[in-house]
């Protein structure tokens, strides 16, 4: 069952261009280094907040990624632009059209 990581964070307005520049390298590092990484979407919210929606093939893939942290330069550069972690959640994506 696909696992969805929801991470909400705050970025100071002057840091937004650097965050967006770092995103490409972060995603490249995820594709190269994170087994089970499927997709990521970045959403801008009010009050200088952002929501990163990342889809993993399995919960174990997400857990392994979390354990690695910012182990590569592109990931570290993206994380460096974050002023504050607001919240983080994990959920599952149910099959469409199936009960349960």
For the regions a language model picked out, list residue spans one by one.
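Short, well-ordered beta-strand segments in beta-rich or mixed alpha/beta enzyme
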Residues: 2-10, 38-68
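Short, surface-exposed ligand-recognition loops at beta-strand->loop->(often short) alpha-helix junctions
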Residues: 10-21
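Generic structural motif
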Residues: 12-14, 59, 99
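An amphipathic, aromatic/His-enriched active-site/gating alpha helix that lines ligand/cofactor pockets
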Residues: 25-38, 55-90
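Generic low-complexity segments that are intrinsically disordered, proline-rich and/or Lys/Arg-biased
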Residues: 47, 74, 95-96
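Short, low-order "capping/linker" segments at domain edges
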Residues: 91-100
